[in-house]
Design a protein with these regions (language model features):
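Conserved ABC nucleotide-binding domain
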Residues: 2-5, 11-26
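ABC transporter NBD signature
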Residues: 29
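Hydrophobic anchor residue at the start of the ABC signature
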Residues: 38-39
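A short, proline-enriched helix->beta-strand linker immediately N-terminal to the Walker B motif
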Residues: 43-47
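Catalytic Walker B motif of ABC-type/P-loop ATPase nucleotide-binding domains
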Residues: 49-52
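Short loop immediately C-terminal to the Walker-B catalytic DE motif
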Residues: 55-56
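Helical segment within the ABC ATPase nucleotide-binding domain
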Residues: 63-76
Length: 169
């Protein structure tokens, strides 16, 4: 029992919900419910955590805190795969991917190289570029010439060939 209580306390602390342990879920805000959901996942000590918009609806300070938690998890033998449209804390990510309309991979790599790669001043401008089919094709082809893609190609040639085949359809 003590081990379970300690694990629960650690998960609650990780998502900054101390003092809410006895609160009914129906009485929590949307952001708090989201954090409870993540805390429940943390109890399983996952090796892979897949999150869909985990920071939407959170205040800026909690958004940053949640992204820092994901970064800590990624450095503790847990791969964190996250879908987000919030660009304010992407500098906390080790790698990011940008997909064009239709799921076409246009970029995968370090967040600090994004703006140069897409030739934009503001990261949010990338979304507009990746709505245009011609721009998507341009960046898909550009990505295939990057050192990052070549490293992935060498490590997983079958996966890269399958991705290319799907994008060409």
């Amino acid at each position: 029992r003590a081990e379970i209580a300690a694990a629960v306390a650690h998960a609650i602390e990780a998502v900054d919900l101390q003092g809410r342990e006895k609160t009914f879920i129906s009485r929590l805000s949307g952001g708090q419910k989201k954090r409870v959901s993540i805390a429940m996942e943390l109890l399983a000590n996952p090796r892979l955590l897949i999150l869909d918009e985990p920071t939407s609806g959170l205040s800026p300070d909690l958004d940053r805190s949640m992204m820092e938690l994901c970064r800590r998890l990624s450095h503790q033998n847990c791969t964190v795969l996250m879908v987000t449209h919030n660009m304010s804390n992407i500098n906390l990510c080790d790698k990011i991917a940008f997909l064009g309309v239709g799921g076409v991979l246009c970029y995968y790599g370090a967040p600090e190289k994004l703006n140069d790669y897409f030739d934009v001043e503001m990261t949010s401008d990338i979304f507009e570029k990746l709505r245009d089919p011609e721009q998507i094709e341009l960046y898909r082809e550009k990505y295939y010439t990057t050192p990052e893609f070549n490293r992935l190609l060498a490590a997983c040639p079958e996966a890269a060939q399958e991705a290319d085949k799907r994008c060409s359809q």
